[in-house]
């Protein structure tokens, strides 16, 4: 029974996470295919390169909310003890993150996961999401690099969770952080080379 609940939570999370809001919104708005501009990414940072700040903000919000929704829905549907619901929520978070990174509808070529990372953090332990956002904003303000801001904030997150005794969440977000770093591997190379685009700069 528990295995079935956990598999369902993972699938629910994946389906939520695989909704490509950036692509949907830009198509509705009549802009060019998001995958053909900038980094080719379907996330909010690349949407911003279309010059449509409102669309970028909407993409960021909806991508975060799909992560939060996946966690809440999975926890609600899970029956049994609080521990089962908590485990289901964490599996849904993992599923949502993987769904955004590797959506089946887009031949497994999705986004880099920053907004979804924030969204699942909100659903699982919102104070950590506040810390993430503070670290992101502080790094962005000083460096103007969106990618570096995400890397710094995600690196701090599992440490923060572990420090405050949330070992299971710390382990989960350590995995998500490793995945996020992997998805940003080209950004890391460009940061090292000094060729990474800054916030608001078109590629």
Swiss-Prot record:
SUBUNIT field: Probably interacts with PlsX.
Pathway membership, UniProt: Lipid metabolism; phospholipid metabolism
NAD keyword on record: no
Gene encoding the protein: plsY
Subcellular localization, as worded in the UniProt entry: Cell inner membrane
Taxonomy of the source species: Bacteria, Pseudomonadati, Pseudomonadota, Alphaproteobacteria, Hyphomicrobiales
Family the UniProt entry places it in: Belongs to the PlsY family.
Transmembrane segments: 5-25, 55-75, 84-104, 118-138, 159-179
Function summary: Catalyzes the transfer of an acyl group from acyl-phosphate (acyl-PO(4)) to glycerol-3-phosphate (G3P) to form lysophosphatidic acid (LPA). This enzyme utilizes acyl-phosphate as fatty acyl donor, but not acyl-CoA or acyl-ACP.
GO cellular component term of the entry, any: plasma membrane
Pfam short name (any one): G3P_acyltransf
HAMAP family: PlsY (MF_01043)
Bilayer topology term: Multi-pass membrane protein
Keyword list, A-Z: Cell inner membrane, Cell membrane, Lipid biosynthesis, Lipid metabolism, Membrane, Phospholipid biosynthesis, Phospholipid metabolism, Transferase, Transmembrane, Transmembrane helix
Native source species: Rhodopseudomonas palustris (strain TIE-1)
GO terms for MF: acyl-phosphate glycerol-3-phosphate acyltransferase activity
Catalyzed reactions: an acyl phosphate + sn-glycerol 3-phosphate = a 1-acyl-sn-glycero-3-phosphate + phosphate
Official protein name in the record: Glycerol-3-phosphate acyltransferase
Any single biological process term in GO: phospholipid biosynthetic process
Taxonomic superkingdom: Bacteria
Entry EC no(s): 2.3.1.275
Main location: membrane
């Amino acid at each position: 029974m528990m295995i079935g609940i956990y598999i369902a939570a993972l699938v629910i999370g994946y389906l939520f996470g695989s909704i490509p809001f950036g692509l949907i919104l830009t198509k509705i708005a009549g802009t060019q295919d998001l995958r053909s501009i900038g980094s080719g990414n379907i996330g909010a940072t690349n949407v911003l390169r279309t010059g449509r700040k409102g669309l970028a903000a909407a993409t960021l919000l909806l991508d975060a909310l799909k992560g939060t929704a996946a966690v809440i829905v999975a926890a609600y549907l899970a029956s049994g003890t609080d521990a089962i619901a908590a485990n289901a929520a964490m599996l849904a978070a993992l599923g949502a993150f993987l769904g955004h990174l590797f959506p089946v509808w887009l031949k497994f070529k999705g986004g880099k996961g920053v907004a979804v990372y924030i969204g699942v953090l909100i659903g699982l332990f919102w104070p950590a999401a506040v810390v993430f956002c503070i670290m992101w904003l502080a790094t962005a303000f000083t460096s103007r690099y969106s990618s570096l801001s995400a890397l710094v904030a995600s690196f701090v997150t599992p440490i923060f969770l572990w420090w405050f005794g949330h070992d299971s969440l710390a382990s989960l977000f350590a995995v998500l952080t490793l995945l996020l770093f992997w998805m940003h591997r080209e950004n890391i190379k460009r940061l090292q080379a000094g060729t990474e685009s800054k916030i608001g700069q078109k590629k």
